[in-house]
């Protein structure tokens, strides 16, 4: 309905709406579980307008307020996303935004006690992959995962003006992960924006969607 009211005829893909631990499932499409107070709900959705796709993710607290643990994880993801967007500059290569998210998420998980060990070793061994198991983004255009190489002659492709990509880091703590404190289990958070590369710097085309915890709580309190 919201897509149609805004002038779009079709969704760009099947929406992902994962409440509670279902937010830890990357492509959860059943979208049928009851939302419960105290849970988060992860919404990954976008419409197709004039043959171009959008792909946006936000994570909301079901009852309008983040718990302390949810906010702590959310803020790590947001810090990683903002830094990755800053890395979406002409002349940087495709992997730089992703590597930025890896470094910040690893440091954040260490600070929260979810990961333990030496920071450099954890990054090198990919220990973060238990909680962040996907790339930071993909090309976006007339298809959600649009065509285009990520490497050319085995070298990461350099970002150029006019390119559009998603930036979507996340942290997903399985409810079955008994290596972490129970207070963290079942938290799944992703924040995704659509970014246009321009000579003067990245443009966030989905910037109107609130994404700080303060703005999200204010939005929900206003409904």
Model-identified regions with their sequence ranges:
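Active-site neighborhoods and metal-handling regions in enzymes and metal-associated proteins
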Residues: 1-223
């Amino acid at each position: 309905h919201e897509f149609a009211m805004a002038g779009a005829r079709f969704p760009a893909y099947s929406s992902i709406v994962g409440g509670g631990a279902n937010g830890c499932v990357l492509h959860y499409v059943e979208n049928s579980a009851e939302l419960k107070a105290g849970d988060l709900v992860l919404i990954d959705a976008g419409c197709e307008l004039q043959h171009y796709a959008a792909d946006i993710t936000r994570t909301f607290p079901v009852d309008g307020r983040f718990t302390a643990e949810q906010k702590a994880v959310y803020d790590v993801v947001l810090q990683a996303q903002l830094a990755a967007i800053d890395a979406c500059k002409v002349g940087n290569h495709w992997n730089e935004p992703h590597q930025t998210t890896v470094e910040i998420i690893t440091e954040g998980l260490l600070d929260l006690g979810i990961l333990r060990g030496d920071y450099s070793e954890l990054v090198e061994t990919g220990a973060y992959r238990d909680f962040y198991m996907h790339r930071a983004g993909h090309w976006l255009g007339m298809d959600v995962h649009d065509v285009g190489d990520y490497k050319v002659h085995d070298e990461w492709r350099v970002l150029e003006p006019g390119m559009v990509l998603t930036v979507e880091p996340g942290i997903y703590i399985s409810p079955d992960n008994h290596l972490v404190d129970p207070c963290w289990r079942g938290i799944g958070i992703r924040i995704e924006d659509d970014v246009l590369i321009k000579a003067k710097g990245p443009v966030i085309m989905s910037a109107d969607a609130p994404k700080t915890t303060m703005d999200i709580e204010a939005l929900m309190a206003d409904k």
